[in-house]
Structure formats: C-alpha cells, structure tokens
Amino acid sequence: MSEPTGLPPLLRVTSVTVAAPDPRALAEFYSRLLGWEIAVTEPARPGFPAEDGWAQMAPPPGQVGPTLNFEYEQDYVPPVWPSEPGRQQLQTHLDIAVAEVGVAVAWAESVGARQAAHQPQEHVRVMLDPVGHPFCLFLSD
C-alpha cells in the first residue's frame, strides 16, 4: 500500500442511490420527469414483497453525470421538509437545472410531483416526488 501524498486520490462520484418503498415505480417517475431511460431493473428477491428490487437510470448520450439508483427500503418513511425536530430528516436531494421554472413545475406536476408547501427562494421551486423526496427545480444560467 502506498503512502498518502497529501493530495486526494482520484475519487469520482458515479451514482446517487435513493431509498424507496417501490424502487421500480419511483424510477418510472424520474424517467418521465427527466426523459432518461431506465437502464437496469432487478425483480424482488425470493421471499420479499413484490415492491422489493432495484432500478438504475443513466444520463442520456451526450449528458455527463452520475447514474440514479433506486433501492428498496422496507421501512421507508418519507422525509419532512423543511425539517422538524423528532421527524424523519432529509438525507439528500436532487437539484435540477431548468430553462424556465414555471414550465418545469407544470411538467413535474403533470408526471406526478407536487410542490412543497414551503418555498424559500423565488427562482427555485421545491418539489416532492411521489414518495415524498424533495427535489429542486432551479433556473440555470
């Protein structure tokens, strides 16, 4: 094993994994929202509920970015946003650049998202996916 040089080794984020009570259904939502194809799915494991499984989406050709993975969480509890003491906390969220916030909000709602009650910024809209994960639509430069 080599000694550290003081510089970080090459580390590259390749995926973001999202917990879901039905990962294939949530992948379908994000596929419609983003226009990405679902690249891989896995069925429920033997002895697990039908919702068990896994799905992965990759950016379309020409777009650079990590894959989005969706994995089964049997005891999934939707996060509360903004956070409240003693309630399920947000672990991560997606920021999605858009050309027009209003158009993007309408699109997101048409495929199954809803706007969060709290909207802290004028040029950003906090949306909730079908299982309650927040994601932000923000005006790109």
Annotated model-derived regions:
Residues 6-11, 17-68, 103-106, 110-118, ...:
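Core segments of cupin and vicinal oxygen chelate
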Residues 129:
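Short, acidic, Ser/Thr-enriched surface-loop or helix-capping motifs
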Residues 59-86, 90-97:
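Conserved, structured core segments of small domains
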Residues 119, 137-141:
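Short beta->alpha transition motifs characteristic of CBS
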Residues 13-15, 92-93:
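Short active-site oxyanion
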Residues 2-9, 81:
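A detector for short, charged/polar N-terminal pre-domain segments
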